[in-house]
Amino acid sequence: MKPSHSDTPLMMPSVMKCGYLATAGLIGICTHLSYFRYGEHHLYPWRYVRFHLCLTMGVAALLYAKKPPQYTLCSMDLVKDVSLLMATYLVGLFASLLLYRTLFHPLRQIRGPWAAKISSFWLSFRLRRGPSFRILHELHEEYGPVVRVGPSEVSIIHPEAVRMIYGPNSRCSKNTFYDNGHPMMSLHSYRDRIAHDQRRRVWSAGFGDRALRGYEQRMRVYRQKLFQRLEARAVAESAINISQWFNFYSYDTMGDLAFARSFDMLDASRNHWAVDMLMHGMIGYRYLFPSWFFRLLATMPSLSSDWHKFIGFATDTMLRRVGEQVDVPDIFASLLAPLNGREPTEDERNMLMGDAMLIITAGSDTTATSLTSIVYELARHLDEVDKLRAELDPIEADSDGEYQHDTLAKLPHLNGFINETLRLHPPIPGVIPRKTPPEGIHVKDVFIPGNMTVFSPQWSMGRSEAAYIDPEIFNPERWYKHMDLVKDPSAFAPFSIGPYSCIGKPLALMNIRTTVARLIMSFDVRFPEGEDGIRWMDAADEHFAMGIHQMPVVLTRRH
């Protein structure tokens, strides 16, 4: 008697099943070796999700077309066989990837945590413990100046690395990280060097001496408000969170320079709702997810709603600014000049939107962090405050207590103090990624192959004995009097260096110098009783830029 189909124990004949499984695994291996090993695949991650869903349906259709007796359209046997084949395909793909990254990868000789060789998510997982600049510093203390921190990522702490990766003659380019906001573009996110240089020329028109004097008029309005608020709180001589007030000041200022309208945070003494949305939306940058995963998350409304709310607010505000004429030029005026009064195209709107976001985020966070770090060092080094006041005393301030910036820019100790603070507390302390050229680069006798991601964290670089003598000692005089204490000046790059350096550096330094000079001459600064500020500095977080959320100090009016 012949067995019935219901007596058949296998979902498909065993020989056929083994052949199908072997083919599926081989296809997975070939997919990795012939496709995913080459090029970039981060811009449209959902395409790969859709492709594999279609592949699954295609496999199901092929099996169903064979019509083994037990298959029906909704058969669990069909579902199990398709699932097994797809799982085998994925096992082949990831097994090939795993073997390649651990045994055959061009970076296999570079030291680092074993798990970092396998996946970029290793670093993202470690960042739950703290910001990247501290985690990377720990890794360098354990593994040395050159550390593999991901499958294709290398962190290097050496002055030569700063020159080779970021310097004016560097052949490194920007990596996939800068596509996270695509299709919204900004000067910061252009990866193509020619396109970047063309856009930078447009920006440069807004950072000449004449333009900076115009911005100073705008900033002075908000600086006056800031000091009025600080003076009112100094009367009580109780602790205030100076970091919060610098954030209010910075966002109000940069909102005005970007959109010709303030966020009015100094007036309200609280964050604007859109700034809260921005801060929440930037949290994803803290974990340095692979670009494809970041872009996957960014399309999920439940995970990126705050970010998209801010973009909506900024888009509406930017479009209003496009149609306005302003009496005192702002940065955006130079960015609008190429339009010659016409409406922007969709690509130009994305570009203007990206640039507006860049002005706000880069200008606000970095300035507020730098000012907070300077106050921290002022409160820790009262002897340095005396030197700064001795330098400022001969200079005449106006009736509002403001100093001419041209004069401040020439003061050696003031600028040495600012530099020393930025050395130890750089506003961008961790990862500024670059992609090595096809021919690779040599750094500190180590060859980094082409198309790898490299970076040199400024927080660790500022503490490197290869760059500075006694790097842990705060000594402003190393920048003008004892310059032998700086072994290699190229290691100091708080605004980065080279073709992709911060174009807003002159504006930031003007803002910092004028604010710090007035603060020093207006107030005595100290920590509250029993505090030294260290725990608040140690609690600093990072979402590309450093964020110091708390820095309580007591201000006492001097006059």
From Swiss-Prot:
It catalyses: tryprostatin B + reduced [NADPH--hemoprotein reductase] + O2 = 6-hydroxytryprostatin B + oxidized [NADPH--hemoprotein reductase] + H2O + H(+). InterPro entries: Cyt_P450, Cyt_P450_E_grp-I, Cyt_P450_sf, Cytochrome_P450_monoxygenase. Its main location: membrane. Pfam families: p450. The chain crosses the membrane at residues 13-35, 48-65, 82-104. It is a multi-pass membrane protein. One of its GO terms (cellular component) is membrane. Keywords: Heme, Iron, Membrane, Metal-binding, Monooxygenase, Oxidoreductase, Transmembrane, Transmembrane helix, Virulence. Its cofactor is heme. Gene3D superfamilies: Cytochrome P450 (1.10.630.10). GO terms for biological process: verruculogen biosynthetic process. Its EC number is 1.14.14.118. Heme binds at residue 502. It is found in: Membrane. The keyword Oxidoreductase applies. Belongs to the cytochrome P450 family. Cytochrome P450 monooxygenase; part of the gene cluster that mediates the biosynthesis of fumitremorgins, indole alkaloids that carry not only intriguing chemical structures, but also interesting biological and pharmacological activities. The biosynthesis of fumitremorgin-type alkaloids begins by condensation of the two amino acids L-tryptophan and L-proline to brevianamide F, catalyzed by the non-ribosomal peptide synthetase ftmA. Brevianamide F is then prenylated by the prenyltransferase ftmPT1/ftmB in the presence of dimethylallyl diphosphate, resulting in the formation of tryprostatin B. This is Tryprostatin B 6-hydroxylase. It comes from Aspergillus fumigatus (strain ATCC MYA-4609 / CBS 101355 / FGSC A1100 / Af293). The gene is ftmP450-1.
